[in-house]
Curated annotation (Swiss-Prot):
Any Pfam family hit: Sugar_tr
Extracellular membrane side: 45-135, 188-195, 246-248, 359-368, 417-425, 506-551
Subcellular compartments: Basolateral cell membrane; Basal cell membrane
Spans traversing the lipid bilayer: 24-44, 136-156, 165-187, 196-216, 225-245, 249-269, 338-358, 369-389, 396-416, 426-446, 485-505
Source taxonomy: Eukaryota, Metazoa, Chordata, Craniata, Vertebrata
Keyword rRNA processing: no
Entry remark concerning the domains of this protein: Multiple cysteine residues are necessary for proper targeting to the plasma membrane.
Protein name, per record: Solute carrier family 22 member 6
Additional notes on this entry: Involved in the renal transport of a variety of drugs with well-known nephrotoxic potential, therefore may play a role in the etiology of the drug-associated nephrotoxicity. Uptakes the diagnostic agent PAH/para-aminohippurate and clinically used drugs. Mediates the bidirectional transport of PAH/para-aminohippurate.
UniProt keyword list: Cell membrane, Glycoprotein, Membrane, Transmembrane, Transmembrane helix
Length: 551
């Protein structure tokens, strides 16, 4: 398309692209930390009831006299005796005296702070009858991501990618910092919800702003770079959480850097492609000329003019007279087809992904080690995904990553629970495939939707992903019916969803669509022929420049 020619005219992948892409993806390091932060800030340490205030432990026979034990000889977490017992309450799985009555922990709990000195669980006693509140914080965070995906995806198509990114950086910095100083759990949840909203906007606009400034052949590199930065953030979280085990300091440490991101984001250059779609050619020209200067192509930038842009962006200007709305995703057949297929892919990826990564304490090994392993597996997985994306295409990469992830999880469901090494290995492999699926779906979605509704489409896709992340914890409760049932559900959904990829067009080597007409031509299977006909009707860029300058 003509816009890709304009990008080549002002330097292709030059100094500007390298600088802006680096600065835009840098916040993804800490976005990964926020997404799984509650694995550490809401970790549940071993705990037991606090004895009554009037208890005399030296006279009563010690702390154990007040604590009933389970069949493995460990103190029960949520019960204590109403009066001290003369001997251990359980012996070989049976109660020793048979007369000890128990009661809830009315005087609070004593926590083992050796691994987690301070978490929201220990500070606000989110255990026993209040245990469900622990998940509420994560659920509200994910609900915020869902809301943010819809709101900021829509606003980015109306106000531009740069303005929304600036707002998102500031909101994340303020809400994340305030969460660290929360006086109670209600305030904490409120600020976590606001953080989720803004981080959703960052994820969406980071990818789009970068992709819209890159030539066709380099878009996959941008998507892969963003994925690797996110994976590196998982390593970063494990190290930072180990060094800073206090939840308030950890929350503060992953939030304050967004103030710096907010400051330098004012120097971002808005997407010239977005400017051209609403028909603001004067701003498009200024943006392209500024990029040309940064890339050392000042002469080529000076040759651009309003007349050249009108000639080469004729189709975009014609179609921009009517702004697309979110309802177009359902009203237009081509967009509806994309929306339904991509929604299923987004939902399945997130549903299975968060089913694995938000249960790190369930592996029975160091939570820090599992966090590192889960981050490490992303590196080779995303490298393979990148090679497939660039050689075979987006569609086979998306299908294979979902299919393999689902198979790993399904097989995990039939492995005996005492085979911890095999089960953990399968979970790690499945997580790597799902991380690759996320990497691919961001790029694939951005390339499938036309410019005028690209952010709205990405926002709706991310919304479906958040629905998956909210539903995922509910599925884990089915383990009460059958221990492996959650794994069967987590595995079946991505396997079934992978079939939807076959209904989508391939975008490898294809120009970004700007209009619904481009989608219709893809559905007819004639994108390249239509492109050739357009090129015959359109005045070539170089010829226009030469004519303008009397050459």
């Amino acid at each position: 398309m003509a816009f890709n020619d304009l990008l080549k005219q002002v330097g292709g992948v030059g100094r500007f692209q390298r600088i802006q892409v680096t600065l835009v993806v840098l916040p993804l390091l800490l976005m990964a930390s926020h997404n799984t932060l509650q694995n550490f800030t809401a970790a549940i340490p071993p705990h037991h009831c606090r004895p009554p205030a009037h208890a005399n432990l030296s006279k009563d026979g010690g702390l154990q006299a007040w604590l009933p034990q389970d069949t493995q000889g460990r103190p029960k977490s949520c019960l204590r005796f109403t009066s001290p017992q003369e001997r251990p309450p359980f012996l070989n799985g049976t109660e020793a005296n048979g007369t000890g009555t128990t009661e809830p922990c009315t005087d609070g709990w004593i926590y083992d702070n050796s691994t987690f000195p301070s978490t929201i669980v220990t500070e606000w006693d989110l255990v026993c009858s209040h245990r469900a509140l622990r998940q509420l914080g994560q659920s509200l965070y994910m609900a915020g991501v869902l809301i943010g995906a819809m709101v900021f995806g829509y606003l980015a198509d109306r106000l531009g990618r740069r303005k929304v990114l600036i707002l998102n950086y500031l909101q994340t910095a303020v809400s994340g910092t305030c969460a660290a100083f929360s006086p109670n759990f209600t305030v904490y949840c409120t600020f976590r919800l606001l953080s989720g909203m803004s981080l959703a906007g960052i994820a969406l606009n980071c990818m789009t702003l970068n992709v819209e400034w890159m030539p066709i052949h380099t878009r996959a590199y941008v998507g892969t770079l963003a994925g690797y930065v996110y994976s590196t953030g998982q390593f970063l979280l494990a190290g930072v959480a180990y060094a800073v085990p206090h939840w308030r300091y950890l929350q503060l440490l992953v939030s304050v850097p967004f103030f710096a991101f907010f400051v330098y984001s004012w120097f971002f250059i808005e997407s010239a492609r977005w400017y051209s779609t609403p028909g603001r050619l004067d701003l498009t020209l200024k943006a392209l000329q500024k990029v040309a200067r940064i890339n050392g192509k000042q002469e080529e930038g000076a040759k651009l003019s309003m007349e050249v842009l009108r000639t080469n962006l004729q189709k975009e200007l014609t179609m921009s007279k009517g702004q697309a709305s979110a309802m177009e995703l359902l009203r237009c057949p081509a967009l509806r087809h994309l929306f339904l297929c991509l929604s299923l892919l987004w939902f399945a990826t997130s549903f299975a992904y968060y089913g694995l990564v938000m249960d790190l304490q369930g592996f029975g090994v160091s939570i820090y080690l599992i966090q590192v392993i889960f981050g490490a597996v992303d590196l080779p997985a995303k490298l393979v995904c990148f090679l497939v994306i660039n050689s075979l295409g987006r569609r086979p990469a998306q299908m294979a990553s979902l299919l393999l992830a689902g198979i790993c999880i399904l097989v995990n469901g039939v492995i005996p629970r005492d085979q911890s090494i095999v089960r953990t290995s399968l979970a790690v492999l499945g997580k790597g495939c799902l991380a690759s699926s996320f990497n691919c779906i961001f790029l694939y979605t951005g390339e499938l939707y036309p410019t005028m509704i690209r952010q709205t489409g990405l926002g709706m896709g991310s919304t479906m992903a958040r629905v998956g992340s909210i539903v995922s914890p509910l599925v884990s409760m089915t383990s009460e019916l059958y221990p492996s049932l959650p794994l069967f559900i987590y595995g079946a959904v991505p396997v079934a969803a992978s079939a939807a990829t076959a209904l989508l067009p391939e975008t490898l080597g294809q120009p970004l669509p700007d209009t619904v007409q481009d989608l219709e031509s893809r559905r007819r299977g004639k994108p390249r022929r239509q492109q050739q006909e357009q090129q015959k009707q359109m005045v070539p860029l170089q010829a226009s420049v030469q004519e303008k300058n009397g050459l």
